[in-house]
Amino acid sequence: MSTHKNFDKICVAVLIVTLLLTLLFINGEKLGIRVIVDEDAQEDSPADHFTANDLNADWDASGATVITLNGSSASISGSGAYMNQGDLIIAQAGSYVLSGTLTDGSVVVDTTNGSKVWLLLDGVDLYCSEDACLRADQAEKVFLTLADGSKNRMESGETYSQTALDDGTGGVIFAHDDLSINGSGSLEIVANYKHGIDANDDLVIAGGSLQISAPADAIHCNDSFRMTDASVTLEAGDDGLAVSGAQGYVYLRSGSLEISSIGDAVHSAGDVILEGGSLTLNTSDDGIHADSSFSMSGGDLSIPQCYEGIEARTIELSGGNLSIYCLDDGLNANGTDAGFGGFGRDQQLAVDAADSQETWIHVSGGSLLVVNESAQDADGLDSNGDITISGGTVLVSLCNSGTNCAIDYGSESGGVCEISGGTVIACGSYSMAEGFDDSSSQCSVLYNINSGASSGTQVSLLNSSGEALLSWQVPCSFSSVILSCPEMTLGESYTVQVGDQEEAITLEEISASFGDAASSMFGGAMNWGGMQPRGGQAPQGNAGGRPDMGQAPDMGDRPTPSDGEAPMGELPTPPDMNGMPTPPEMGDMPTLPDGEGPMGEMPTPPDGTEPAQAEPAADAAPVSVTVSGTSSLLIGACGLLLLAAILLALRFRRNG
């Protein structure tokens, strides 16, 4: 009997300990309980798109395997790598230093899942006639570091082998898994077949200078493209930078990105997020196309040449400087894939996307300049839903001869156009002019000009003391202008100056209209018979979501250079906007021109020797993150249930 009593006491003690552990797990976050995890395996949060390893280009290479390439052979000092029929095989996790030349072969990373590989390129020249120069067939993540001061080059042939094609190989660099590039050296990539870099998962560029030319996409990845502290130049026969996954995104924190492309300069099946850096985009199609959202909170984005500037379902500008020279809309918020246009895209008719998805343009900060000197029907800001402006500076100049709107919103589908802050000077044609709604909280003026105004005309708004609240030398001819700034007040008198003409006005309503455009400036009575529906809806019979404009504008001949670079041709120089007067208090105008976790099992090279474990990078130490409260609760509850079941079984056994 005493034995049973002692056993009962032990069971009670275990039960009490289990309850305490369960409470500890449930309150783990408050008590600071932490667990060791692999930081590169974690999904990046929107607040931090880069891991410590992505940003560390100074990892310790003292224990790395050193490889010197020599034509079709290599000198290897260390373990984990071997040559196989002219290809360098990286067969185990760890760090490697590469230099020299491969005349016709690939560097192939083929390790176990969960393995990480660091490659330091220190003067590498790779050529492969029928496959990728660098393949990441299997690894959790590959870190490619460009050694300080080094010059590296990779070039592929014009056709790939059937084996490479069967594997889906589409780039000079091809990665099945995550790829991260950093360092302070340079890398030139010349693709003669398809893409420059083709990554199935995430691509991070966190340093170095990259020049990539390709007949298709210069960079193509599935999950995400993230860039900081790098200088990247892309030339592409199709899209410059493309992210194809529906949940994918493009993220730029800092650095310099220059793109010349025939297709979209930047194309994302998900989002595009710009927080800093400098972008210059020259393209025959969209400057930036995002199937979901575009947001810009900092940096400088210049699009000197494009068909359409930025196209997305939602567009938000909260900071930075954005300038667009376009042939069609500057900003276009359209709600579905079917509503997106562009040269070379699927032949789809546009629809009124406001009926299916919420669309909007919101400007709360930064500066926006849109200039369209073409005479076609186009809009400066075009939304199938709402347009709201609460801050920043918006300047729009559209050619007077087209039936365009400086600001066009989906009024027919319930959209609103409101201003509550910021500065706006938006010039275009009188025939389709739309002002801000009466529901706005900041005053505005829609002013129509009785004789039209030629390009270069100065537009100003003066207060009752003769001080200029707004002033801009407008690049294109115009017959209508929208003016708004925080200093405008109901009941006050102002003077609108257009060149040598001026008119005194008094603001008696929040959104006022003045002036009178004479029909003679349109060559007689205006022809409304061919007017297209507003709100971004394309006419029937024309694909791509734009009015019928005949042949695409001539972008110039694009000869193929003898060195195999993608045909880019000469790009026109954008209009010179230097020397323009800066409106008072409008801000700067856009300038125109880890040792983390197990390293896995290592395959044995063909010579039969067992490779030793290479030393990991210096920063390969695991990092800790807080366990979620939900996970802790589940762990504790499961433990408690398991213990209760054991005690119950023992009790039945004893009584039995």
Q: Model-derived features: where do they sit?
A:
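A composition-driven surface/loop motif
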Residues: 2-656
